[in-house]
Swiss-Prot record:
Induction entry: Expressed in the late phase of the viral replicative cycle.
Segments of this protein annotated with the region Disordered: 81-157
Membrane-spanning segments: 32-52
Organism, scientific name: African swine fever virus (isolate Pig/Portugal/Lis 60/1960)
Protein name, UniProt field: Inner membrane protein p54
One Gene Ontology term from the biological process aspect of the record: microtubule-dependent intracellular transport of viral material towards nucleus
Ranges where the record places region Interaction with host DYNLL1: 149-161
Entries under Pfam families matching the protein: ASFV_J13L (PF05568)
């Protein structure tokens, strides 16, 4: 008998089906997606670090050059004409009739103390808006015509605030907490 006749006949692809094939790994199929995600995350982190460092530098420079106006609406006004009322305390920066310079050491401006509200000051502008706008200012002024400024002693006095501000000015680095505490 011929041996070719008894040879088993297999389909052509049958051998390929029997050979073991490995499924590709997750990393090999998604390699480019993972690499792009890593690059994007690194870029985002670099941008955030740059933004926060520049904000910190700007805040430190602003405090150093006194571009930030600290909340003290009395610091630019002369207090020579104002007599102290009994039972009230004067804010930091106020002078007595005999003193020529404010307590803070800043030179006094030529702006006299009047019943007119201070303009171009964001703190007093917000206070005027909160108390009823410009119409409320004349009513408040007519209620106490002889007392242009009345101060109330609170737990956080102006002298404590000024000492905190002076401490901040003497330091080289500042944090958000420092800026919040100074205001």
């Amino acid at each position: 008998m011929d041996s070719e006749f008894f040879q088993p006949v297999y389909p052509r692809h049958y051998g390929e089906c029997l050979s073991p094939t490995s499924t590709p790994s997750f990393f090999s199929t998604h390699m480019y997606t993972i690499l792009i995600a890593i690059v994007v995350l690194v870029i985002i982190i670099i941008v955030l670090i740059y933004l926060f460092s520049s904000r910190k530098k700007k805040a430190a420079a602003a405090i150093e050059e006194e571009d930030i106006q600290f909340i003290n609406p009395y610091q630019d006004q002369q207090w020579a004409e104002v007599t102290p009322q009994p039972g009230t305390s004067k804010p930091a920066g106020a002078t007595t009739a005999s003193a020529g310079k404010p307590v803070t050491g800043r030179p006094a401006t030529n702006r006299p103390a009047t019943n007119k509200p201070v303009t171009d000051n964001p703190v007093t502008d917000r206070l005027v808006m909160a108390t009823g706008g410009p119409a409320a200012a004349p009513a408040a002024a007519s209620a106490h015509p002889t007392e242009p400024y009345t101060t109330v002693t609170t737990q956080n006095t102006a002298s404590q605030t000024m000492s905190a501000i002076e401490n901040l000015r003497q330091r080289n680095t500042y944090t958000h907490k420092d800026l919040e505490n100074s205001l």
